[in-house]
Amino acid sequence: MFSHLINLFYPKSCAACASFLLMQEIVICTGCRHQLPEANHHVMEDNDLVRKFYGRIRLEFGATLFYFHKAGLVQDLIHKLKYKGLGDIGEVFGSWYGEDLKSVAILKNADFVIPVPLHQKRLRERGYNQVSKFGMALSAHLNIPYNDWVLVRKFNTKTQSRKSFFRRIDISESTFDVELT
């Protein structure tokens, strides 16, 4: 009852289109959710992502939640997640994808959900790691432990958003360490 009154005077709005959210909607309205270009890689063993990494790394499974298009809805939401402090977007995406991934047999043997870490300087600037809530939501839905200490960023690299896929791979190989203790 009280939450209904709060919503009446301070309605929540969609992170994508800014329209008011209905009571059952969380962060993103139904209309915008249906516009998101879902990749459905988790139902295809041989998909775009797996082919992109073929011959570069040993990959047993690869999937992505959405297709990314420049100036598209996904880019806008990721920008708000990373730079505008809307961490709830990550949690919602993680919950949606966690539900989808429950049907993937190979993930039942996964040891951890591991987020890509930020360097301490960038973490202080942003205030949080934008993939933390995504990873925690995946972890909860898949019942796989969340581990944010095993992968460590050694260097504070410049933003890679304008670099090619292959250049990002080169940079990443020397940027991270694994700590097993």
Task: Please state what every model-predicted region is.
Residues M1-T181:
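Glycine-rich phosphate/pyrophosphate-handling loop used in enzymes and phosphotransfer proteins
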